[in-house]
């Protein structure tokens, strides 16, 4: 047999009972969820900034980052909705490399999924408690989101997962916004089809149960660029791309048309400093066209305490990415204030 059982994992309800949320955290989440919903339904004109490390690799540095973000939030909350990006599981192009805190609570040690599910719940809970900001994470494994579904205020379905039926159907069960990224090919139709699926009701098997979902009216798109058959990056944040997306939304019966622009990945060709320019161009396009201003609800930025990235070894720099390169804190802070002025 090609698979062995390493450990029996607790059910989500059991983990939640062991690591419960305080009444204060529940109040924070309820308030922020309501404010974020108002942005996606058009009741609020605040601009969303989903910002944080490529991967949440260390509890201390991530919580320090989020606490710094909270201080910035105090100055921009009248214009912006800051959502910390706390990604605890990472898709890998070849399946090799660091797969996130869920797999490896300590990046330089062997995977331990039992310790991992505890570590990610503890991290998200601590981040909210210390900052007052609920976070975004990626739904890489649909069944595992049940360990965090009472904590998160935003989830994303990645470029390699967006065509997968289980991801689409699970997204239809969420009561928070879920961003469906364009696939690595860059195909807008595939992306919008995934939004349609996520907004619809479905009956399917989930964690050993026969379930029926209501559909998620806050499902929307995330533009992250694509690659052609020669692996050359194809950005999709330019004005013409946004107008094309607007036209395609018009031709589909979708609720609450909305888009988030991911300033990194194939939009920047992983040239992390380009995120500053890309965000500026997106803001210019929104301000130039009132319909785009209604469609483009926010941006996604990869940033950490220290800029760039590093290899996993014993001499790691605190607060520096061990996956894709990120903006450093000083650039991030300046960029957020600039967004608040221009959005």
Which residues make up each language-model segment?
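Conserved, mostly hydrophobic/aromatic
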Residues: 52, 261, 328
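Internal helix-turn-beta structural module
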Residues: 304-343
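Active-site-facing alpha/beta catalytic cores
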Residues: 66, 79-244, 265-266, 270, ...
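Short acidic, Gly/Ser-rich segments with clustered Asp/Glu that frequently serve as metal-coordination loops
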Residues: 54-57, 256, 264-270
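N- or domain-start disorder-to-order transition segments that initiate the globular core
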Residues: 1-41
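Conserved phosphate/anionic-ligand binding catalytic regions in large, soluble enzymes, centered on
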Residues: 48-61, 324
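Acidic (Asp/Glu)-rich catalytic clusters
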Residues: 40-43, 70-77, 126-130, 213, ...
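N-terminal beta-rich core of secreted/periplasmic extracellular enzymes
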Residues: 25-39, 72-83, 89, 113, ...
């Amino acid at each position: 047999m090609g698979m062995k059982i390493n450990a029996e994992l607790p059910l989500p309800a059991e983990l939640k009972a062991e690591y419960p949320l305080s009444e204060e955290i529940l109040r924070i989440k309820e308030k922020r969820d309501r404010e974020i919903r108002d942005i996606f339904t058009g009741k609020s004109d605040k601009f969303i900034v989903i910002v944080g490390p490529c991967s949440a690799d260390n509890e201390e540095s991530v919580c320090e980052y989020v606490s710094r973000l909270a201080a910035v939030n105090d100055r921009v909350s009248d214009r912006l909705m800051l959502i910390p990006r706390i990604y605890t599981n990472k898709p890998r192009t070849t399946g090799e490399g660091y797969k996130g805190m869920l797999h490896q609570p300590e990046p330089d040690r062997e995977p331990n999924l039992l310790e991992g599910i505890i570590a990610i719940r503890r991290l998200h809970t601590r981040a909210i408690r210390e900052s007052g900001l609920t976070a975004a994470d990626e739904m890489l494994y649909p069944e595992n989101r049940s360990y965090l579904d009472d904590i998160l205020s935003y989830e994303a379905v990645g470029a390699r997962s967006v065509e997968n039926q289980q991801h689409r159907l699970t997204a239809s069960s969420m009561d928070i916004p879920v961003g469906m990224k364009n696939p690595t090919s860059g195909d807008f139709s595939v992306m919008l089809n995934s939004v349609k699926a996520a907004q619809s009701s479905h009956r399917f098997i989930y964690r050993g149960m026969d379930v029926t979902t209501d559909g998620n009216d806050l499902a929307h798109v995330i533009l992250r660029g694509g690659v052609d058959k020669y692996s050359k990056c194809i950005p999709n944040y330019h004005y013409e791309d946004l107008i094309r997306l607007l036209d395609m939304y018009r031709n589909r019966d979708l609720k609450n048309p909305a888009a988030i622009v991911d300033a990194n990945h194939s939009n920047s060709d992983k040239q992390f400093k380009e995120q500053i320019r890309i965000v500026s161009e997106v803001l210019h396009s929104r301000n130039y066209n009132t319909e785009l201003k209604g469609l483009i609800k926010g941006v996604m930025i990869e940033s950490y305490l220290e800029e760039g990235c590093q290899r996993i070894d014993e001499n790691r720099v605190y607060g520096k990415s061990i996956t894709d390169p990120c903006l450093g804190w000083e650039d991030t802070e300046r960029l957020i204030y600039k967004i608040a002025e221009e959005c």
